[in-house]
Swiss-Prot record:
This is Putative NADH dehydrogenase/NAD(P)H nitroreductase XAC0554. InterPro entries: Nitroreductase (IPR029479), Nitroreductase-like (IPR000415), Nitroreductase_HadB/RutE (IPR050461), RutE-like (IPR023936). HAMAP family: Oxidoreductase_RutE_HadB. Its EC number is 1.-.-.-. SUPFAM superfamilies: FMN-dependent nitroreductase-like (SSF55469). NCBIfam families: PRK05365.1 (NF003768). GO terms for molecular function: oxidoreductase activity. It comes from Xanthomonas axonopodis pv. citri (strain 306). PANTHER family: MALONIC SEMIALDEHYDE REDUCTASE RUTE-RELATED (PTHR43543:SF1). Belongs to the nitroreductase family. HadB/RutE subfamily. CDD domains: RutE-like.
């Protein structure tokens, strides 16, 4: 399929122009079916060598939120505990083990063999890409998102990923946003401030 057709203005608004970072959510649950549908969109986003290093934990239960709570900064705790879903966006630093399946037309695994430190940058970069896809896919499905980094990564890793090569990156609260929790819309940089032609 060639990407030849632009999305209409309403779709672009939903994804970008009128979408907001949410700080409060309606008391409406998000089903596991919707979260699975969300991942089924996210997985198609491009990553280097189709490495797909992101790993997602959808924290929806009271037990899961209790496990997450000690890692949250004071300013993020209340809204995170109240959100229907908090996604831990993480990455697997041993992602290369799956490359024979994910990238079969080249020996991509050999590119990343060796000390784990040599894979950290790629895992972080491509996992971050997948986290961004998650936010846009959520918006496309009618969900609202509140991404944040105000938490203790080491505590999250100990609570959710102990004994594994998986490292947390950032959190995303998901649900159906409550406009009462929005801050006034902040400005963005103009093209000339952020970009140039060469």
């Amino acid at each position: 399929m060639l990407m030849s057709d632009s999305l209409n203005a309403a779709a672009l608004d939903q994804l970008f122009r009128t979408a907001r970072t949410q700080n409060a959510f309606a008391d409406t649950p998000v089903s596991h079916e919707v979260l699975r549908e969300l991942y089924e969109l996210v997985k198609w986003g491009p990553t280097a060598a189709n490495s797909c290093p992101a790993r997602f934990v959808f924290v929806t239960s009271a037990e899961g939120k209790a496990k997450l709570k000690p890692a949250l900064s004071e300013g993020n705790a209340a809204k995170t505990l109240a959100a229907p879903v908090t996604v831990i966006v993480a990455h697997d630093e041993d992602f290369h083990e799956k490359l024979p399946y994910l990238f079969p037309h080249a020996d991509a695994k050999s590119w990343f063999d060796g000390p784990r430190e040599g894979r950290t940058e790629s895992a972080f970069r491509n996992g971050s890409l997948q986290g961004a896809y998650l936010i846009l896919a959520a918006r496309a499905l009618g969900l609202d998102a509140g991404p944040m980094s105000g938490f203790d990564n080491a505590k999250v890793d100990a609570a959710f990923f102990a004994g594994t090569p998986i490292k947390s990156n950032f959190l995303v609260n998901l649900g159906y946003g409550d406009p009462a929790g929005l801050f006034p819309r902040s400005p963005r940089l103009s093209f000339d401030e952020a970009a140039r032609f060469e």
